[in-house]
């Protein structure tokens, strides 16, 4: 219910009320009524004070006076007259304060209105209208010293409003005459603002920002921003753009060093010219908006931006923006451009432009950058970028490629092929880098795959290694899988667009799904982890289906930091979605908390794990190899809280009254290696955490009340567990009877804990 006022840097003052926007510059006042999001375009009214005459005297008016802002009032000081606009939520009150010293006779004020709307009289004054809506210009009044309002003759002559003040009112004005008409929307559209293409990014300590495209008309889209707390409460809002420039497909990212957000969008500053515009802002108690600027002022057209930020605290960090690029006048065919922006909003360096030698009609399209570039040292810090190669032909195959983007651009490094087979690959999304130690520098690429001729669309995922602090590792694809089974999607349904991010440990995937029986759409959200170099479902996954006829457009992991300032996994994700109903389009948002710490694997003969060494297969999934007591194989599970440091491990289905050792490894070996009568999937540095004797029921738990926690025990053994690290646990135990196997010990299935 408040009027928004902005000075975006175009030498005009802008205001937006509940049903109008207006701009004020040296060219005069421009009023743009809201006729509904489905209006084909804007229908503005441009007001220009043309003349004021008193008797035979014409007042000298300064037609180039600048607009001045004071609270909710805009004033033009035009010599002997002040032209004023008082801004209210549903109307604008125009007034003219005229110095009448020495004037006599009737006074005539002429105001030219440049508009496509048709003007006509009604009982209230003048109405400008078309089939989409109407704007009223009320009969003007003179405000007398007593406060009484004297109606004035207000007429329309062609495109000129004429307001006549009788001579006696001029004489009685005591040197100052106030003429006061009101501009407002006299018939509201039946629908409100439609919202499209929301995006989300995270700042620090759980705060997050949404940006969304607001449709003012079919040729004028605005961009709004909202700041939400960790508790899902809207803290503040900001209007990133509500000028008459068309802004579409907004993206948002955060720079921790400057503590500024950057929003970018595909904009059209002039007819037929598309550029990527950006604007920085802060959203604290003393929020600030910085001037709008073009990231791509060069020749050619620029479309479909994607944006990455940097959550590292040191100086010199940047944002990265990549967009589609079409330059028909350039000597070579260019298809993509990258721009780097400093934390304070300056373009850094030349960026990069890709002008590949592609077959005629083929283009790189739909780029997708990761939200952040990880926590590696700056020399080995990368954003992940996925993009499609399209032939431009309908129903043709598309291929999906990947590059890593360091500061300054990718240089001559060759791209990776993520999916180069037959079929249609689209809607790619790239997570922020995840992992620690040897597992660091990994990103998840999620995308939609549709068979060329028949079959349901599905979501696929690729785990890509883009580097780590200890090496200059070349990029490599570690694993590719259909994500349906990992995230719990329904195979018989159609999966559509997906989006992904990482909190530095695991990944989250949000996707749209269409029920093939009812044609209803919904959104699924789930977490995915890694076991070694393989993608795996995350234990304790949270799945959320919120609403129908929606598609996810953005997901962002909430950033969390330890007392020392080091990042720690938050297990919290912010999801933005576009919602469509029978009448309008809007947005939905959700905050997902993914509580799963445990991932279960290493059941021999299932998944990636090799079969048992001597035909002693487990009786069911989640068991280790069968033992001589024929329990079906030992199983291991986890429980407790990371926050309370109360994680405990419980083994069951072991041999009764047997010696058992709780084992920790810092590397997962998904295939397993033969270990006694079973398969060991815990690798790397192995620690014996505890020795136990199983119960008569073949059970054992570690730790129990009074014992050090697993984290404290590992630290005492010289192997501290950093936040975000993964450790693998198994229990091996005495199994001396033969049962067809030569060894005298066996081992449970494995549980991976995300610390």
For every predicted segment, state its role:
Residues 1-184:
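Residues that cap or anchor secondary-structure elements
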Residues 1-7, 11-14, 18-24, 182-595:
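Extracellular, repeat-based ectodomains that mediate carbohydrate processing or recognition
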Residues 74, 94, 107-111, 152, ...:
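Hydrophobic residues positioned within well-ordered beta-strands of beta-sheet architectures
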Residues 107, 117, 138, 221, ...:
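Short beta-strand/loop motifs in extracellular/secreted proteins, especially
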Residues 120-124, 397, 459, 657, ...:
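Short coil-to-beta strand junction motifs in C2/discoidin
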Residues 595-755:
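Residue-level hotspots within well-ordered secondary structure
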């Amino acid at each position: 219910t408040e009027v928004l006022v902005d000075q975006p840097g175009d030498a005009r003052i802008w205001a937006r009320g509940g049903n109008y926007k207006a701009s004020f510059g040296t060219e005069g006042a421009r009023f743009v009524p809201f006729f509904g999001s489905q209006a084909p375009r804007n229908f503005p009214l441009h007001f220009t004070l043309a003349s004021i005459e008193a008797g035979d005297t014409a007042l000298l008016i300064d037609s180039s006076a600048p607009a001045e802002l004071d609270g909710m009032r805009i004033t033009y000081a035009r010599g002997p007259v002040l032209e004023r606009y008082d801004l209210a939520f549903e109307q604008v009150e125009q007034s003219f304060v005229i110095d009448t010293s020495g004037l006599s006779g009737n006074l005539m004020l002429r105001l030219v209105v440049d508009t496509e709307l048709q003007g006509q009289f009604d009982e209230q004054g003048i109405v400008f209208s078309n089939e989409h809506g109407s704007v009223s210009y009320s009969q003007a009044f003179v405000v007398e010293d007593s406060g009484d309002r004297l109606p004035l003759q207000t007429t329309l002559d062609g495109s000129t409003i004429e307001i006549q003040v009788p001579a006696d009112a001029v004489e009685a004005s005591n040197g100052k005459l106030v003429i006061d008409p009101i501009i407002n929307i006299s018939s509201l559209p039946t629908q409100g603002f439609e919202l499209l293409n929301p995006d989300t990014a995270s700042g620090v300590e759980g705060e997050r920002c949404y940006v969304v495209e607001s449709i003012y008309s079919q040729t004028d889209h605005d961009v709004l921003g909202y700041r939400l707390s960790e508790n899902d409460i809207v803290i503040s809002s900001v209007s990133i753009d509500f000028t008459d420039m068309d802004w579409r497909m907004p993206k948002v990212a955060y720079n921790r060093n400057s503590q500024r957000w950057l929003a970018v969008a595909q904009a059209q500053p002039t007819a037929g010219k598309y550029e990527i515009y950006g604007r920085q802002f802060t959203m604290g108690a003393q929020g600030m908006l910085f001037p709008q600027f073009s990231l791509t002022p060069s020749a050619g057209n620029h479309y479909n931006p994607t944006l990455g930020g940097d959550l590292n605290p040191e100086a010199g960090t940047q944002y990265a923006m990549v967009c589609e690029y079409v330059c028909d006048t350039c000597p070579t065919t260019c298809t993509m451009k990258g721009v780097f922006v400093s934390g304070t909003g300056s373009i850094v360096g030349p960026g990069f432009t890709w002008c590949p030698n592609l077959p005629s009609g083929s283009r790189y399209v739909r780029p997708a950058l990761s939200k952040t570039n990880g926590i590696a040292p700056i020399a080995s810090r990368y954003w992940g970028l996925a993009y499609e190669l399209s032939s431009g032909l309908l129903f043709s195959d598309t291929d999906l490629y990947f590059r890593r983007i360091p500061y300054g651009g990718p240089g001559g490094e060759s791209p990776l092929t993520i999916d180069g087979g037959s079929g249609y690959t689209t809607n790619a999304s790239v997570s922020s880098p995840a992992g620690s130690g040897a597992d660091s520098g990994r990103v998840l690429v999620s995308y939609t795959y549709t068979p060329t001729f028949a079959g349901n669309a599905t979501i696929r995922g690729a785990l890509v290694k883009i580097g780590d602090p200890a090496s200059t590792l070349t990029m490599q694809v570690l694993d590719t899988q259909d994500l349906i089974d990992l995230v719990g999607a329904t195979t018989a349904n159609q999966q559509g667009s997906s989006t992904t991010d990482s909190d530095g440990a695991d990944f989250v995937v949000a996707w749209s799904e269409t029920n093939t029986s009812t044609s209803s759409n919904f959104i699924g959200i789930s977490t995915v982890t890694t076991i070694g170099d393989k993608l795996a479902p995350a234990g304790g996954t949270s799945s959320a289906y919120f609403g129908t006829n929606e598609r996810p457009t953005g997901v962002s992991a909430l950033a969390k930091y330890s007392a020392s300032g080091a990042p720690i996994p938050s297990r919290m994700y912010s999801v933005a979605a576009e919602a469509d109903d029978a009448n309008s389009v809007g947005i939905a948002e959700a905050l997902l908390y993914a509580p799963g710490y445990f991932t279960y694997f290493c059941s021999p003969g299932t998944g990636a794990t090799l079969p048992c060494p001597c035909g002693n297969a487990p009786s069911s999934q989640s068991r280790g190899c069968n033992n001589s007591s024929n329990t079906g194989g030992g199983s291991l599970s986890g429980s407790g809280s990371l926050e309370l440091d109360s994680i405990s491990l419980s083994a069951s289905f072991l041999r009764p009254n047997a010696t058992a050792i709780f084992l920790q490894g810092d590397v997962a070996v998904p295939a397993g290696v033969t270990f006694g009568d079973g398969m060991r999937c815990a690798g790397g540095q192995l620690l014996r955490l505890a020795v136990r004797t199983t119960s008569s029921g073949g059970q054992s738990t570690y730790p129990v009340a009074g014992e050090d926690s697993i984290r404290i025990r590992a630290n005492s053994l010289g192997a501290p567990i950093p936040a975000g690290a993964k450790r693998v646990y198994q229990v091996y135990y005495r199994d001396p009877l033969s049962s067809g196997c030569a060894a005298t010990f066996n081992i449970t299935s494995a549980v991976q804990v995300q610390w």
